[in-house]
Amino acid sequence: MLTIALDSQQSSAPPPWAYTVNPPASAREDARELRRDRAGAASGREGGPGARPAAAAADPAPQTVPGTGVSLTIAQTRDAFNPPDWHPDQHPPMPTSVAHGRRPELRACGFCHLVNGQGRPENASLAGLPAAYIIQQMADFKSGDRKSAEPRMGPPNAMIQDAKAANDEDITSAAAYFSSFPYKKWVRVVEAKDVPKTRIAGSMHVPTNDGAEPLGQRIIEMPEDLRRTELRDGSSGFVAYVPVGSIAKGEALVKTGGNGKTVACATCHGVDLKGLGPVPPLAGRSPSYTVRQMFDLRQGVRKGPWSALMKAAVEKLTVDDMIAIAAYTASREP
């Protein structure tokens, strides 16, 4: 039985709660989402990865979010070549690659990752990452050294397309921009036995408003405010529900290596997990994203420079270990 349990945890099948694959659209679901949009809880998607039918964006009423005088329609917030900038006074001037991209082949970086680089669970938070690290990841996406263990997941495939379409100036200017300002606290980590029921829409978990369910050995990360998230408000973050006891378990693994199961993360990721040179920070970042990266590295689908070091650090980890590590790192202050 122990062997069976270990084999299950070491399975090559990616955990579906972390690799959020959009289900096939249905007319009934589209109609329900359109009604929700009209009610002001826009849970639809945009013209990028995981796009929804255009009908859901047809509401012409101006929308706004707290702390801004900007008003935009839902359709405007879903323009992959002109992402909404609700708080233009809170970031430096954007380079073209972040603000607009290049039609038709290169989406604006600020569309998926938000103009302030805070990102979403289905992609990376770019704010505060080392410029050299961002540049290397784009090279890895372009060369095929960085892929996803779940080939059906939209955002990694979009990154491969965008990396191939981007030129050196696009990449270096975006990297310099996102690395020039800090990442802010974005994820509230909560240990829980039960969580709101969710479904996958637009490559992320969204609540169904239909009661609760056991969390089990998963991380469920969802918007704090669905409407603001779908309007791409870079001031509205996420809540991540993690198993009870996972933060303490993760702390032990992160700080000690768990008696040889892994290595102390601070060795490479720096004191307080805030990064070290070109090595990225982990503190406060999306736990869903962190699990995906550990799993991808363990499976060998992410294999750029320095990946061999990380492969050695994750090759003995079970998915439960990854959950614990990600719960702990996400709970730390950025």
Question: Where do the language-model regions lie?
Answer:
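Sec/Tat signal peptide C-region and signal peptidase I cleavage site
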Residues: 4-9
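Flexible coil segments in periplasmic/lumen-exposed cytochrome c-class electron-transfer proteins
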Residues: 10-107, 146-264, 299-334
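Short, cysteine/histidine-rich loop/knuckle motifs that typically chelate Zn2+
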Residues: 111, 267
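Cys/His-rich metal-chelating microdomains
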Residues: 115, 271
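Short cysteine/histidine-rich zinc-coordinating motifs and their immediately flanking basic loops
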Residues: 120-126, 277-283
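Short microdomains enriched in Cys/His and/or Lys/Arg
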Residues: 130-142, 286-298
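Intrinsically disordered, low-complexity segments enriched in Gly and acidic/Ser/Thr residues
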Residues: 257, 264, 272-278, 286-291, ...
